[in-house]
From Swiss-Prot:
It comes from Mus musculus. Homotetramer. Interacts with PRMT3; the interaction is direct, inhibits ALDH1A1 aldehyde dehydrogenase activity and is independent of the methyltransferase activity of PRMT3. This is Aldehyde dehydrogenase 1A1. The aminobutyraldehyde dehydrogenase activity is negatively regulated by ethanol in vivo. The keyword NADP does not apply. Expressed in retina. Expressed in lens and cornea (at protein level). Expressed by midbrain dopamine neurons. GO terms for biological process: 9-cis-retinoic acid biosynthetic process; apoptotic process; cellular detoxification of aldehyde; embryonic eye morphogenesis; fructosamine catabolic process; fructose catabolic process; gamma-aminobutyric acid biosynthetic process; maintenance of lens transparency. GO terms for molecular function: 3-chloroallyl aldehyde dehydrogenase activity; 3-deoxyglucosone dehydrogenase activity; acetaldehyde dehydrogenase (NAD+) activity; aldehyde dehydrogenase (NAD+) activity; aminobutyraldehyde dehydrogenase (NAD+) activity; benzaldehyde dehydrogenase (NAD+) activity; NAD binding; retinal dehydrogenase activity. The active site is at E269 (proton acceptor), C303 (nucleophile). Cytosolic dehydrogenase that catalyzes the irreversible oxidation of a wide range of aldehydes to their corresponding carboxylic acid. Functions downstream of retinol dehydrogenases and catalyzes the oxidation of retinaldehyde into retinoic acid, the second step in the oxidation of retinol/vitamin A into retinoic acid. This pathway is crucial to control the levels of retinol and retinoic acid, two important molecules which excess can be teratogenic and cytotoxic.
C-alpha cells in the first residue's frame, strides 16, 4: 500500500505581513513589562524582519499565573471532556492546514529553511503530530489493580500541571507542536518560550490556538532570551515541568535550575554526534543518499545529524567519491527561491562556529574534498563541505558542528566500529546500512542511541518515541511514551466491605 501523495508545492507568499509580535497570555496580546523589544532577522539577507516584544521574568510570572489559573480545579479546561480536548487539537491542525502557505513562508523567511521542506515536511509533520495527539486525548487512562485484602485499587493518569516549554530555532514550528500537542492532550497548561531567533511562527500559532477555541490561559507564549525568560521558566516555583530541546550545555543549566527550585519534572532533547555505519555489503546508492541527507538536511542544523560516517575500508574510496559528487550538486541561495536546496545558517554565531570547526579539520589533517568556506558575501551561508581521512580524535569527529559538514571515517571490523561509534558522550541517534539481517540486529542492539535507523536515516513519525541516551537527554517525545511524560500516575486504594473476584 503506497503512502498518500504529497501536496503540490505552491509559490511562497510574496507579500508576507507579520501580524503578531507581542506576548500571548490569557488569549490576549501584551507588551513586555520592561517595554523592551528585540530584532528578528532574515538569515539569508541579515536584514531585520520586525521587532518582537522581549519577555523576561516579569512576563513569565504573568504567564505562569494565567496558566495556573486555567489549571484550577473546576476551571473550564479541567472540567472539559477529554474528547473535547482532542477536538480542539484537531481544529488547530485544520487551521494550520488552512494557513499552511503563510506558515511555510514565515518559517523559510525567519528560519532559513528551504521553502519546499517547510511546506511539505515541517507543516506535514506538525499536522500529523497534532492529529496523533488529538486521537490520544480520550484514551489516556489508568487501570484497576487486584490488591490484597478488601481493597479496590485503581490508577489515574493525571496532567502534571503548568508546563514550561522551551523551543529551539532549528525546527521552531515542529518542536512547538511536539511540545504543546502531548501536553494539551493530557490536560496540562503551558508557558512556551520560542527561540529568540525564530519566534514568528509560534506567535502566529498563538492566534490559531485562540481561534480554535482553547480557553484563556491554557497556552501562553513569551518570546525572549534564554538567560532571562528561559531561566525564569526553569527556576519558577510554580512551574511543574519543563521541557527543552536544544544544546547539551543549556540542558544542564535547565536541569540544575529545576533541581535548585521545586524539583520540577524535566524532559530534555539535546545534542548529538550520531554515527552512521556503512558496511561493504550495503546498497551504496541508498547509503550515500541517506547519509548525505542525514547530515546536509536543513544546512546540517539537526540534532540527529549523521555527523560521523563510518565506512568499511573496501568501499571507502567509492563512498567518498559519490558523497563528494552529491554534495557538489547543491544550489545555495535565498530559501524562498525555487530551485534552491540549501539556505543559510541561522545566525552569525552559528556560521562562525561552523567555519572555525572546518578550519580545525584542515589543521588537524583531514582531507578537504569540497567546500570548506563561506558562500557569498551576504547572509550566513556555508559551502557544503566533505572531509575524508578523518580520525576519531579530531574536533570535527567529536564536537557537534550543526552545519553542512560531512566527516567520513574508515573502519575494518564490526567490533571496531561499534566501539568507536559508542565512544561519545552523546547517544541520540545512529544509522547502519547492510543487507545482512544478523549484522543489522546485532549492531543495532549494541549501539547506544535512542533511535537506530537501518538502511534509512532520519525517518521520524508521530507514532514513534524519540529521545536520547547519555548526554543527549532525558525522557521521550512522540508516541505513547511521549504522552506519558506529561502525566503523573496516581494510585487510589479504597476500603470496601467485601472484595469479589
Amino acid at each position: 500500500m503506497s503512502s498518500p501523495a504529497q501536496p503540490a508545492v505552491p509559490a511562497p507568499l510574496a507579500d508576507l505581513k507579520i501580524q503578531h509580535t507581542k506576548i500571548f497570555i490569557n488569549n490576549e496580546w501584551h507588551n513586555s513589562v520592561s517595554g523592551k523589544k528585540f530584532p528578528v532577522l532574515n538569515p539569508a539577507t541579515e536584514e531585520v524582519i520586525c521587532h518582537v516584544e522581549e519577555g523576561d521574568k516579569a512576563d513569565v510570572d504573568k504567564a505562569v499565573k494565567a496558566a495556573r489559573q486555567a489549571f484550577q480545579i473546576g476551571s473550564p479546561w479541567r472540567t472539559m471532556d477529554a474528547s473535547e480536548r482532542g477536538r480542539l487539537l484537531n481544529k488547530l491542525a485544520d487551521l494550520m492546514e488552512r494557513d499552511r502557505l503563510l506558515l511555510a513562508t514565515m518559517e523559510a523567511l525567519n528560519g532559513g529553511k528551504v521553502f519546499a521542506n517547510a511546506y511539505l515536511s515541517d507543516l506535514g509533520g506538525c499536522i500529523k503530530a497534532l492529529k496523533y495527539c488529538a486521537g490520544w486525548a480520550d484514551k489516556i487512562h489508568g487501570q484497576t489493580i487486584p490488591s490484597d485484602g478488601d481493597i479496590f485499587t485503581y490508577t489515574r493518569r493525571e496532567p502534571i500541571g503548568v508546563c514550561g516549554q522551551i523551543i529551539p530555532w532549528n525546527f521552531p514550528m515542529l518542536m512547538f507542536i511536539w511540545k504543546i500537542g502531548p501536553a494539551l492532550s493530557c490536560g496540562n497548561t503551558v508557558v512556551v518560550k520560542p527561540a529568540e531567533q525564530t519566534p514568528l511562527t509560534a506567535l502566529h500559532l498563538a492566534s490559531l490556538i485562540k481561534e480554535a477555541g482553547f480557553p484563556p490561559g491554557v497556552v501562553n507564549i513569551v518570546p525572549g532570551y534564554g538567560p532571562t525568560a528561559g531561566a525564569a521558566i526553569s527556576s519558577h516555583m510554580d512551574v511543574d515541568k519543563v521541557a527543552f530541546t536544544g544544546s547539551t550545555q543549556v540542558g544542564k543549566l535547565i536541569k540544575e535550575a529545576a533541581g535548585k527550585s521545586n524539583l520540577k519534572r524535566v524532559t530534555l532533547e539535546l545534542g548529538g554526534k550520531s554515527p552512521c555505519i556503512v558496511f561493504a555489503d550495503a546498497d551504496l546508492d541508498i547509503a550515500v543518499e541517506f547519509a548525505h541527507h542525514g547530515v546536509f538536511y536543513h544546512q546540517g542544523q539537526c540534532c540527529v545529524a549523521a555527523s560521523r560516517i563510518f565506512v568499511e575500508e573496501s568501499v571507502y574510496d567509492e563512498f567518498v567519491k559519490r558523497s563528494v559528487e552529491r554534495a557538489k550538486k547543491y544550489v545555495l541561495g535565498n530559501p524562498l527561491t525555487p530551485g534552491i536546496n540549501q539556505g543559510p545558517q541561522i545566525d552569525k554565531e552559528q556560521h562562525d562556529k561552523i567555519l572555525d570547526l572546518i578550519e580545525s579539520g584542515k589543521k588537524e589533517g583531514a582531507k578537504l574534498e569540497c567546500g570548506g568556506g563561506r558562500w557569498g558575501n551576504k547572509g550566513f551561508f556555508v559551502q557544503p563541505t566533505v572531509f575524508s581521512n578523518v580520525t576519531d580524535e579530531m574536533r570535527i569527529a567529536k564536537e557537534e558542528i550543526f552545519g553542512p559538514v560531512q566527516q567520513i571515517m574508515k573502519f575494518k571490523s564490526v567490533d571496531d566500529v561499534i566501539k568507536r561509534a559508542n565512544n561519545t558522550t552523546y547517544g541520540l541517534a545512529a544509522g547502519l546500512f547492510t543487507k545482512d539481517l544478523d549484522k543489522a540486529i546485532t549492531v543495532s542492539s549494541a549501539l547506544q542511541a535512542g533511535v537506530v535507523w537501518v538502511n534509512c536515516y532520519m525517518m521520524l513519525s508521530a507514532q514513534c518515541p524519540f529521545g536520547g541516551f547519555k548526554m543527549s537527554g532525558n525522557g521521550r517525545e512522540l508516541g505513547e511514551h511521549g504522552l506519558y511524560e506529561y502525566t503523573e500516575l496516581k494510585t487510589v486504594a479504597m476500603k470496601i466491605s467485601q472484595k469479589n473476584s
